[in-house]
Amino acid sequence: GWEIPEPYVWDESFRVFYEQLDEEHKKIFKGIFDCIRDNSAPNLATLVKVTTNHFTHEEAMMDAAKYSEVVPHKKMHKDFLEKIGGLSAPVDAKNVDYCKEWLVNHIKGTDFKYKGKL
C-alpha cells in the first residue's frame, strides 16, 4: 500500500487531473478527517453523502468515456459504500483507519489508472 498522510489531508500526490474529481476527493479526505476529529453521527453522515456524490460523478464519467475498467471499479465503490453505510457513530479507530487506508489505496491504485482516459 501507499503511505497514509498525517495529518490526513489531500495533497498533490493524489491529483487525478480532473478538477471536479480532485475537488470531490478533497471532500472525502475532509470527511474522514472530520470523523477522526469528532466521530459523531453528523460527520459520518456527511462522509457517506460526499462519498456517494463523488462515486456517482466518477462512474458517470467512466461510463461516458466507455472506460474499460468500469465494472470492477464500480464494485469497489459499492463495497466501500456498503461498509461505511453500515457504520454507526461513534466510529471506532479501526473503521476510521480502514477508511483512511481504503481512500489512499483506491485513489493511487485504482483511480490513477483512468488518468487521461475519461
Swiss-Prot record:
Pfam families: Hemerythrin. CDD domains: Hemerythrin. Fe cation 2 binds at E58, H73, H77, H106, D111. It comes from the Eukaryota. Keywords: Iron, Metal-binding, Muscle protein, Oxygen transport, Transport. GO terms for molecular function: iron ion binding; oxygen carrier activity. The keyword Transport applies. InterPro entries: Haemerythrin, Haemerythrin_Fe_BS, Hemerythrin, Hemerythrin-like, Hemerythrin-like_sf, Hemerythrin_metal-bd. Fe cation 1 binds at H25, H54, E58, D111. Muscle. Belongs to the hemerythrin family. Myohemerythrin is an oxygen-binding protein found in the retractor muscles of certain worms. The oxygen-binding site contains two iron atoms. PANTHER family: BACTERIOHEMERYTHRIN. Monomer. This is Myohemerythrin. It comes from Themiste hennahi.
